[in-house]
Amino acid sequence: MSGFDLSEVAGPVAEVIDDKNEEVEFVVFGVQTQPNKLVVDAKGKGGLEEVKAALKEDALQFAYYRTISGDEESKRVKFVFISWAGEGIKKPKLRAVMSILKGDVKNVINNFHIELHATSLDDLVEDEIAAKIKKAGGADYSFNTTSN
């Protein structure tokens, strides 16, 4: 246990998961150390680009977002979990918090298809993430594009 207050996590995560909620497709949580808790830094819609805009170079953050994946035969909602430790973090002790806290956060945010750890915005490339989601997704009908 990390000793961090995660009470503000479940509600916004439920908003991202809710199919009827068209206003919230992502949430970004910031790690606060005085007192130790996660707080909502940003939430909204707009996909990966808005998630990236909310990530801070000198912060520890967690992001959770909804995306659509699939092929012409089947489109499915997928969820991505990102742990972020910006390259601008100067205190090694703060970076160490990530390894302790990440497991606790994943106990609350436990519905995701892929998990990424990033330290630079260059680590978060839409096409690469889509490929990872597709690989993790199971069925792929793209090989059969003609009907029998």
UniProtKB/Swiss-Prot annotation:
<dbReference type="GO" id="GO:0031143">
    <property type="term" value="C:pseudopodium"/>
</dbReference>
<keyword id="KW-0963">Cytoplasm</keyword>
<dbReference type="GO" id="GO:0030833">
    <property type="term" value="P:regulation of actin filament polymerization"/>
</dbReference>
<dbReference type="GO" id="GO:0051015">
    <property type="term" value="F:actin filament binding"/>
</dbReference>
<dbReference type="InterPro" id="IPR029006">
    <property type="entry name" value="ADF-H/Gelsolin-like_dom_sf"/>
</dbReference>
<dbReference type="Pfam" id="PF00241">
    <property type="entry name" value="Cofilin_ADF"/>
</dbReference>
<keyword id="KW-1003">Cell membrane</keyword>
<protein>
    <recommendedName>
        <fullName>Coactosin</fullName>
    </recommendedName>
</protein>
<dbReference type="InterPro" id="IPR002108">
    <property type="entry name" value="ADF-H"/>
</dbReference>
<keyword id="KW-0472">Membrane</keyword>
<dbReference type="GO" id="GO:0030427">
    <property type="term" value="C:site of polarized growth"/>
</dbReference>
<dbReference type="GO" id="GO:0031234">
    <property type="term" value="C:extrinsic component of cytoplasmic side of plasma membrane"/>
</dbReference>
<dbReference type="GO" id="GO:0001891">
    <property type="term" value="C:phagocytic cup"/>
</dbReference>
<keyword id="KW-0597">Phosphoprotein</keyword>
<comment type="subunit">
    <text>Interacts with 14-3-3 protein 3.</text>
</comment>
<feature type="domain" description="ADF-H">
    <location>
        <begin position="1"/>
        <end position="134"/>
    </location>
</feature>
<keyword id="KW-0009">Actin-binding</keyword>
<feature type="short sequence motif" description="F-loop; important for stable binding to G-actin and F-actin">
    <location>
        <begin position="71"/>
        <end position="76"/>
    </location>
</feature>
<comment type="similarity">
    <text>Belongs to the actin-binding proteins ADF family. Coactosin subfamily.</text>
</comment>
<keyword id="KW-0966">Cell projection</keyword>
<dbReference type="GO" id="GO:0030864">
    <property type="term" value="C:cortical actin cytoskeleton"/>
</dbReference>
<dbReference type="GO" id="GO:0005737">
    <property type="term" value="C:cytoplasm"/>
</dbReference>
<keyword id="KW-0206">Cytoskeleton</keyword>
<comment type="function">
    <text>Actin-binding protein which is involved in F-actin stabilization. May play a role during phagocytosis and pseudopod formation by contributing to the maintenance of F-actin.</text>
</comment>
<feature type="modified residue" description="Phosphoserine">
    <location>
        <position position="147"/>
    </location>
</feature>
